[in-house]
From Swiss-Prot:
Native organism: Mycolicibacterium smegmatis (strain ATCC 700084 / mc(2)155) (Mycobacterium smegmatis)
Oligomeric form and interacting partners: Monomer.
Transmembrane spans: none
Function as written in the Swiss-Prot or TrEMBL entry: Releases the supercoiling and torsional tension of DNA, which is introduced during the DNA replication and transcription, by transiently cleaving and rejoining one strand of the DNA duplex. Introduces a single-strand break via transesterification at a target site in duplex DNA. The scissile phosphodiester is attacked by the catalytic tyrosine of the enzyme, resulting in the formation of a DNA-(5'-phosphotyrosyl)-enzyme intermediate and the expulsion of a 3'-OH DNA strand. The free DNA strand then undergoes passage around the unbroken strand, thus removing DNA supercoils. Relaxes negatively (but not positively) supercoiled DNA, concatanates and knots circular ssDNA at 52 but not 37 degrees Celsius. Preferentially nicks supercoiled DNA at C(G/T)CTT, cutting between the TT residues, binds ss and dsDNA with the recognition site.
Classification of source organism: Bacteria, Bacillati, Actinomycetota, Actinomycetes, Mycobacteriales
Gene this chain is encoded by: topA
Record-given protein name: DNA topoisomerase 1
Amino acid sequence: MAGGDRGSGGTGNVRRLVIVESPTKARKIAGYLGSNYVVESSRGHIRDLPRNAADVPAKFKSEPWARLGVNVDQNFEPLYIVSPEKKSTVTELKGLLKDVDELYLATDGDREGEAIAWHLLETLKPRVPVKRMVFHEITEPAIRNAAENPRDLDIALVDAQETRRILDRLYGYEVSPVLWKKVAPKLSAGRVQSVATRIIVQRERERMAFHSASYWDVTAELDASVSDPSASPPKFTAKLNTVDGRRVATGRDFDSLGQLKRPDEVLVLDEASAGALASGLRGAQLAVTSVEQKPYTRRPYAPFMTSTLQQEAARKLRFSSERTMSIAQRLYENGYITYMRTDSTTLSESAINAARTQARQLYGEEYVHPSPRQYTRKVKNAQEAHEAIRPAGDVFQTPGQLHSALDTDEFRLYELIWQRTVASQMADARGTTLSLRIGGSASSGEQVVFNASGRTITFPGFLKAYVESIDELAGGESDDAESRLPNLTQGQRVDAADLSADGHQTSPPARYTEASLIKALEELGIGRPSTYSSIIKTIQDRGYVQKKGSALVPSWVAFAVVGLLEQHFGRLVDYDFTAAMEDELDEIANGQEQRTNWLNNFYFGGEHGVEGSIARAGGLKQLVGGNLEGIDAREVNSIKVFDDSEGRPVYVRVGRNGPYLERMVDDPDNPGEQKPQRANLKEDLTPDELTPELAEKLFATPQEGRSLGIDPETGHEIVAKDGRFGPYVTEVLPEPEDGGDDGTAGTPAKKGKKPTGPKPRTGSLFRSMDLETVTLEDALKLLSLPRVVGVDPTTNEEITAQNGRYGPYLKRGTDSRSLATEDQIFTITLDEALKIYAEPKRRGRQAASAPPLRELGNDPVSGKPMVIKDGRFGPYVTDGETNASLRKGDDVLTITDERASELLADRRARGPVKKKAPAKKAAKKAPAKKAAAKKA
């Protein structure tokens, strides 16, 4: 709880309770309000729809709609429950309400914030006047103005949020079970996440279908000093453009199948012809045939809104969208920037003045645009248009002034926002572009024309403060790039000083990055800027997408899920339909559409919407129920990738234990019949890397592995295999014999359980070993692990040397220490091991505790390194002070620093572990000028 210590922001001795979302925000605001204000935080949402069946109160468990948490038979009335971890917060807030005269709900001013305010109102049931306090930056003037000018709760915004919440619940809870039954457990479908996954899968399909084409070109280094000794620069490069009047083909002249789009219009050079031209032109005298000079002007970029901030932070700072929003949240709550969830590029008059003043002070009058620049955009589905994201206050603090107050990430993002805002009020960049055409003859008689293009910036204008980055996978040229050419005139002679022939391959379309995916979603009108970060995180957490560098790569599971949805629920992942649904949801918020009618049509069907809409197809419920039995799980999980050289289809099958290759081949034991041939697929193999040649290699790898010989001690065969997680060796155990009358051997396992029996020993190959060359001796060493080094005489505990997933280590009881090399596993002595244990425990790669499953970056709160460890109840993240279990959907190998720090922050916010909460009680909520909802 925070109380103000400044002069009163209100009148008289009226006591006011101000509720915000976060403790940080509460502390900051309390400092700006008077002693008559008590500021407390709700720590986010205090209630929501049930998360699972256990959350549903007993009185509703028998209801047919209970699993949804929405009474679809009673106007789609939501069932709200107070989160168990928030009950103490609610009790505390109710206690504070007893000692105040007014309640100010000061949550964020968007849909989500308005909904939090409404839920607080419904849960706390205050008996004092209630006002809505709204601000978009946490500065003293803004907070005082908001306190002095409160408004009423905006029920239209609450309705907008609640409708989306209900829609997403219906979509997810009806469609996700289809994926569980037909693809794999723990998968999920969502209104936006499924479309985002489809966009990424579609791009990978394009890459897989792509056929590369080869072409050659000729580059000349031309010397202008032969005719003008003062030419600057004297030498420049030019590309061969035409040969005997025919344009030389470039990559853009080929289609995705590697064929020319207009074969009659271009000339494709091969290595021989390009080389001959280069040789024939070396030393040739050429002349300028045309000079075209144009003025160049570039206007500044608009200030940031949520989506453009995420895109630019990804390109320039390499931040994920989740990381960007987390940092921006901290900057906002500490009063450094305005609210970071906005789709507006507008600046207030005071912000424009602040930006212009700072640009004038830092760069000079000539760098400031003559008049204030205002950036407006027509946003079809804009929500609560605030200001753009900018530095807070009427006078901006420069990054240098905040250097000591911000951590590294905060400083970098603030600097980006500050630069973009100041640059938006600066003058245009100006310069000239120059295009030259240079012609001549090759020694073999061909008439050739070279092109050269240049750009010179004569006045940088806003580029002095800020240059936007380009997407690294898409390519392109930045706005401040210059390419200078000499000032030549038509007819002027130039010599070909050097020529080179270069070969090229056309490239498949680039994979999406977080930045380009956000841009694509925005252009399609799908989702909202405030949700893009969580959507990208969700599709990675669910295993649909993984990052390879900055590229988003779909998994084979994503292919199966998208294929199922396209084939059986096509409208749900149709881009235009999803965008149109956003329009309709906004019409509800604007009062142009009745919420209950719209939800009824969507779920149960009706005449609502265009031909082919979900409503006209009978509604979501019928669509799911009617299609479920008709979905062939094997067909859905079979992705045809290509035909082999004999015309046999090759499929990737998505199995319960991962994807694998399969094709049908002749069965030598049964002439005239066929049998499946299978091959493992490695986890790190991306879909577009699977070629017919690689498939043949994988099929040729024996499933039973490469036999290394017989273990002389056991008589078991030892084989080397290549598995999903890399190469390993294992022993082949004999088939169990049938049991005797006593049933002690060969007893069949109970239904649903795997047969019991000895498991084969296995061992991963060292990094220094190769699957093709590993020997029986190597394998037996690996299978002998862990190796007993000796017994510690002080503790009487056994010390072993082992090979873990993340490297070699020693283990003594629960105390483990990393080893420097794999060879030490077999060579380290007891004395050497004891010396290692005699050293103090260290973090990181020399950690003294059990070797971590994975090492991460530093936690932004504690500043200490985070690691993933394997605990009694499963993997957890720790910074040495706070432990937080990984949750459903979190994966040790793919969890990000942002997600790990989020888990730690959530664990800190929940405080010490509490005893099990009592059973939830449900009660009807009182209407507040909107449709009623159940709550508990």
